């Protein structure tokens, strides 16, 4: 929703909103934290890897896919990852990898795309809030 009042840059903003996004923020969950023989808890920004190609996916503007944040979610009992994916691979259920301290090939963590775009893993229908 864009406010009705005119503001500097409104025309450009409205034009940008009409464009099809080339990358989409997705919510993913890590499938395994023990890929190197010991449990690690990744944090920060890491490259996202397509397991089919072994490469970092790149969107139509040349931007590489990466995680924007990740943390353990006690309510879900899962490790949740946020990251931008090109729209071509932003598919719910898609398997991907993140590279985290990949020493000797022991730092590729499997993850699954859970939500493409807006959404919530915890209480997606806001039922708990309204109870």
Residue ranges: model-predicted function:
Residues 1-131:
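Conserved, structured C-terminal
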């Amino acid at each position: 929703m864009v406010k009705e009042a005119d503001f500097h840059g409104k025309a450009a903003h409205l034009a940008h909103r009409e464009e099809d996004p080339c990358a989409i923020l997705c919510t993913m969950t890590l499938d395994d934290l023990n890929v190197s023989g010991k449990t690690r808890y990744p944090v920060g920004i890491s490259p996202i890897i397509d397991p089919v190609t072994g490469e970092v996916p790149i969107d139509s503007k040349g931007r590489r896919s990466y995680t924007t944040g990740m943390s353990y979610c006690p309510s879900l009992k899962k490790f949740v990852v946020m990251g931008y994916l090109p729209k071509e691979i932003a598919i719910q259920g898609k398997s991907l990898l993140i590279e985290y301290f990949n020493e000797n090939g022991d730092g590729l963590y499997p993850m699954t795309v859970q939500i493409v775009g807006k959404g919530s893993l915890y209480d997606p229908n806001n039922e708990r809030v309204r109870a």
